[in-house]
């Protein structure tokens, strides 16, 4: 399977893809697996290639809320650029992903402006979707909310 199944990698200029490719490792992610915890700086970033990863916010009372899902159009672990994670990344649906050490990606960023732009666009989509989720939760029925989640994944 080619790493280009991940849309973020698929859209890169060939020159940037060739810079990143040698550092990608295909891994199998298991449902329920935590990729990193709240407050940790992720050691790796993941480019999902079938797996779906939930962004989880754990509450002090032990309750967890899924705030976002990341799939083949995303990068998991982008929060490492900002420091410790503000969420827990939990595998919601088993599948494959390509991983890369974050330290490696950080070194390669100056050589890959297209990748940086793609990550920023992905973050913009995430913010837009989170805003829509808030509106949906206040305005739509549970059935309509369920349909939105199915369309996302």
Language-model region placement:
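Residues that recognize and position ribonucleotide moieties
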Residues: 10, 27, 46, 68, ...
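Residues that scaffold the ATP/ADP-binding catalytic core of kinase and kinase-like folds
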Residues: 20, 56, 78-79, 107-108, ...
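Small beta-barrel nucleic-acid-binding modules, principally OB-folds
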Residues: 25-29, 35-38, 153
């Amino acid at each position: 399977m080619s790493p280009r199944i991940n849309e973020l990698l698929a859209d890169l200029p060939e020159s940037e893809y060739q810079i990143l490719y040698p550092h990608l490792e295909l891994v199998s992610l298991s449902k329920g697996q935590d990729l990193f915890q709240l407050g940790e700086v992720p050691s790796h970033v993941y480019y999902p290639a079938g797996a779906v990863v939930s962004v989880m916010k754990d509450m002090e009372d032990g309750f967890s809320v899924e705030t976002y899902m990341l799939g083949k159009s995303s990068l998991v672990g982008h929060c490492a650029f900002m420091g410790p994670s503000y969420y827990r990344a939990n595998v919601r649906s088993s599948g494959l992903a390509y991983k890369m050490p974050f330290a490696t990606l950080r070194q390669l960023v100056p050589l890959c402006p297209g990748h940086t732009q793609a990550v920023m666009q992905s973050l913009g989509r995430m913010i837009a979707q989170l805003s829509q989720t808030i509106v949906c939760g206040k305005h739509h029925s549970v059935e309509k909310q369920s349909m939105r989640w199915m369309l996302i994944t």
